[in-house]
Regions:
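Zinc-dependent deaminase catalytic domain
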Residues: 1-177
């Protein structure tokens, strides 16, 4: 495949990533076969569900005692002010939190592969373009769907998905657009 097409398809995957309603990470994936896009996907909640992909995970009161301030801000990067009131007074408190992805969120790759099945298309011999490297579960789906090559943009902290694909003799290539 020509380099300019590879860049164009990866840019398309990045464009679909912007459709994600997730706040932590936007991921897009497209499946290409015979020089045409046959499926797209991005991370998000199942069809018909609300679009809130994350829960707030609040810092426990004990955590402040054993972590220095820099570690607290790194682990719980967000804060919000909450008004607490009783019958006689009200006051504001700051609470730190991090965003935790809900278990129900579908990954971009699994969404793209599910759409293939829904439309009666085959992934056999296709190429997948993903904005981020796939997790292990998505890599299993990629393998089972018959996709022969994967291009990805950013590496994710867990490389087990890439290792699985390579073990299955699926070509994997990281590209920067």
């Amino acid at each position: 495949m020509k380099q300019k097409l590879i860049k164009a398809y990866m840019t398309t995957a990045q464009t679909f990533a912007e459709c994600s309603t997730a706040r932590r990470l936007h991921v897009g994936a497209i499946v290409v076969k015979d020089d045409r896009i046959i499926s797209i996907g991005y991370n998000g909640m199942p069809s018909g569900w609300d679009n809130d992909c994350e829960d707030k995970d609040y810092m426990s009161r004990d955590a402040g005692g054993w972590l220095d301030p820099e570690e607290i801000y790194e682990r719980w990067p967000f804060d919000e002010t909450v008004v607490v009131a009783n019958d006689s007074e009200s006051f504001e408190i700051d609470r730190r939190y991090r965003l935790k992805t809900k278990a129900e969120v579908l990954h971009a790759e699994s969404n793209a592969i599910a759409k293939l099945a829904k439309c009666g298309e085959s992934g056999e011999g296709a190429i997948m373009f993903i904005t981020h490297s796939p997790c292990l579960d998505c890599s299993k789906l990629i393998y089972q769907s018959g996709i022969k090559k994967v291009y990805f943009g950013q590496a994710y902290r867990d490389s087990s998905g890439i290792e699985f694909l390579e073990k299955c003799k699926i070509e994997v290539e990281q590209i920067n657009v």
